[in-house]
C-alpha cells in the first residue's frame, strides 16, 4: 500500500513527533526507576500503529486489549469486524480505508487487516528499548549521539543492525538444487535466514560486535529484504529516530538499572524473535 511509501511516511513526521512528545511527558512524570518499555516504547508503538492504520481513538484501548493482550481468536475477529464496519461508514486517508475502497473482497480485506494488526508493533517497541540499552552500555557512543542531535539516519541504521530482533525469518523452500556460498541445498529443503547472524557476520562487518554510530552501514537484514521485506520499515525508522531524539534531548543523565533484554529471552511465534522486555531507568531531566 502507498501509505507506507517514502512520501507518505514523510507526511507523518508531525503526527509521530506529537505522539512521541505526549508519551515522553508521561514517562517523565512516573516514579523512578521507570520501565521504559511499559511507559514509552510500547505505548508509542501502539499509538503509531493505530494512527497509520486508521483505528479511531475511541477504539485504540480495545485494540490494545485484543491484539496486544492475550484473548481468544473469536474476540480478535469480533473487534476487527467492528473496526472494518466503522471505517466502511467513516472512511479516511488511512491504510484500512484504502483497503476497503480497493477491489479486494471483504474476506481478503479482513485477512490483510489481521496481518497489519499483528505485525510490526513489537519490533518498533523492541528497537526503541534495546537501542537505549545498547547506548547506555556504550557511553562513548551515547556521548557522540548527544553531541549530534537529532539522531541521524546513519545512527538508526547501525542501531538496527546491532539490535536485530529477528533470530530467523520465514523459511523458504528451494525449488531446485543450488549452491550458496559453498553450501549445497537440494530441491525441497527449507532455508531459514538469520538476521542476527548476518548482521554480526565478520566477513561483512568490521568489528561486528562493536556499536559504531558513525559506521557506514551496508544492507543489514533487520527488516528482511526484497519483495518480502518489512512493508512498514520506513515508518519504523521514523518512529525510532524521533523517539530516541526526543528522549535524549529531554533527559540529561540516564542510568540503566536493569534490562530484561540482557537475559536469554523466549522465542515468539511464528518466527524466532526476541520478545520485548522491561528496561528500568533512572534519570535527571
Task: For every predicted segment, state its role.
Residues 1-285:
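Cytochrome P450
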Amino acid at each position: 500500500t502507498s501509505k507506507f511509501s517514502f512520501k507518505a511516511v514523510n507526511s507523518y513526521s508531525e503526527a509521530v513527533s506529537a505522539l512521541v512528545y505526549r508519551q515522553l511527558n508521561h514517562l517523565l512524570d512516573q516514579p523512578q526507576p521507570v520501565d521504559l518499555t511499559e511507559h514509552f516504547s510500547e505505548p508509542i508503538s501502539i499509538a503509531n500503529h493505530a494512527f497509520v492504520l486508521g483505528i479511531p481513538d475511541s477504539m485504540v484501548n480495545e485494540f490494545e486489549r485484543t491484539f496486544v493482550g492475550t484473548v481468544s481468536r473469536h474476540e480478535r475477529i469480533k473487534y476487527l469486524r467492528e473496526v472494518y464496519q466503522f471505517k466502511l461508514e467513516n472512511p479516511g486517508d488511512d491504510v484500512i480505508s484504502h483497503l476497503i475502497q480497493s477491489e479486494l473482497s471483504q474476506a481478503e480485506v479482513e485477512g490483510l487487516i489481521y496481518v497489519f494488526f499483528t505485525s510490526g508493533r513489537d519490533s518498533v517497541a523492541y528497537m526503541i528499548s534495546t537501542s537505549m540499552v545498547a547506548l547506555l552500555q556504550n557511553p562513548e557512543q551515547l556521548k557522540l549521539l548527544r553531541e549530534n542531535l537529532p539522531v541521524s539516519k546513519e545512527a538508526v541504521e547501525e542501531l538496527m543492525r546491532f539490535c536485530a530482533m529477528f533470530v530467523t525469518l520465514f523459511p523458504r523452500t528451494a525449488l531446485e538444487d543450488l549452491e550458496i556460498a559453498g553450501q549445497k541445498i537440494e530441491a525441497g529443503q527449507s532455508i531459514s535466514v538469520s538476521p542476527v547472524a548476518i548482521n554480526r557476520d565478520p566477513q561483512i562487518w568490521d568489528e561486528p560486535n562493536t556499536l559504531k554510530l558513525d559506521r557506514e552501514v551496508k544492507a543489514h537484514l533487520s527488516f528482511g529484504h526484497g519483495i518480502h521485506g518489512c512493508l512498514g520499515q520506513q515508518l519504523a525508522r521514523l518512529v525510532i529516530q524521533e523517539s530516541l531524539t526526543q528522549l535524549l534531548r529531554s533527559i540529561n543523565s540516564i542510568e540503566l538499572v536493569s534490562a530484561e533484554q540482557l537475559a536469554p529471552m523466549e522465542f515468539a511465534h511464528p518466527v524466532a524473535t526476541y520478545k520485548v522486555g522491561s528496561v528500568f531507568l533512572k534519570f535527571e531531566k
